[in-house]
Amino acid sequence: MTIEEQAGLVKLASPKLAGTTGELRDQALLAVAKALMDNKDAIFDVNKQDMEQAEKDGIAAPVLKRLKFDEGKLRDVINGIHDLVQMPDPLFQTKLARELDEGLTLYRETCPIGVIGVIFEARPDALVQISALCIKSGNCVILKGGSEATKSNKILFDTIYAAVREAGLPENCMLQLEARSEINELLTCQSSVDLLIPRGSNAFVQYIMSHTNIPVMGHADGICHIYVDKDADIGKAIPIILDAKTQYVSACNTVETLLVHKDIAKELVPKLAQVLKEKHVELRGTKEIQALVDCVPATEKDDDTEYLDYILSAKIVESVDEAIDHINRHGSHHTDSIVTENKETALHFMRMVDSAGVYQNCSTRFADGYRYGFGAEVGISTSKLHARGPVGLEGLLSYKYKLFGDGHIVDDYAQGRKKFHFVDLP
């Protein structure tokens, strides 16, 4: 069976899944959580095989960190599933109720997008999170994970699919692609797939966007910035920078570039450099930074690089506006933070920086669906259409209009025999 034919079966399952009750979908999620726990030893063994092969292949350390699926990550994904179960059913929610005329009533109601194709990096925990979000939101899903995690993804998918089927969700509500070559086939399935969410490098995401007619939602690079203003509290700034750089270095919301106001640089940079050195972070600085501390010289390329590694580039700026201009020019519109005690400066920064997330006095690592209280996320979108920032349940929903009448016809209004009165209902 071709990928197009398999995707067609998923499309046929879409209205069946959309019509299920929230109670049934929650039961399916609980079944998934139980199945993952029951099969954890086998899952860990298979993941160990992927890890060993990746190490033999010389895979970079950040990728290895994402690839690992251990007790901690299992606990996190199961907690995320339980959080989703506690959330109200996102479907069939009335967002607008309006009486257009007597006996003619309009409702806008939430519904699933339909079939979502997600192409993601070698992160087994992402497969679980994405699957759970799609189950909760009533969306069928087609999954393609990174090749380094092939065995881990297969056992996780098989475990999840068996659990949801046993719980009563429709056949073909989920599909897993395993071969890299199948990605290009998926890109041609515009009659079956309603939305693609690619996660990966900038080059990969751009490739997906330019080779499909399916709508694409997502982000490419995660070039996040922290700007330390002249009115910053250094006691806050250093822990924030350290957390944003080292808490999970291979994440897309990790800070890559530090901008420091000239008036605070002499006090901040030497202290920060010492702490970064202790954490084995390589500091790359401009000439002005090099004049304050011993560090690796930065190049223009560093302004546009997502390291996903223990590297931080740093630059001194004259003003908050120079910082804003730098971020808007070199950033990826993902997440950027200002450290300052000046409320007006912070608000100016947050208004002018064109990113999905703009923060004051906190780490960029908060850009995450779970930390936003979304339960989990399917990815982070830097698009300004439909969904922006961490994409949780709400970002996986569309809506439909339901109009209830009693023999109403448009010609009565066109000829003036009747008039609309447009009354919003509670």
Placement of each model-derived feature along the sequence:
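N-terminal Rossmann-like NAD(P)+-binding subdomain of aldehyde/semialdehyde dehydrogenases
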Residues: 1-106, 133
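ALDH superfamily catalytic-core signature
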Residues: 9, 121-125, 129-140, 155, ...
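A structural signal for short, well-ordered beta-strand elements
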Residues: 18-19, 230, 316, 339
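Flexible, glycine/charged-enriched surface loops at secondary-structure junctions
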Residues: 20-26, 91, 167-174, 247-254, ...
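C-terminal core of ALDH-fold dehydrogenases
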Residues: 27, 325-426
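Aldehyde/semialdehyde dehydrogenase
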Residues: 41, 180-207, 250-358, 415-426
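Rossmann-like NAD(P) dinucleotide-binding subdomain of oxidoreductase/dehydrogenase enzymes
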Residues: 86, 95-231, 235
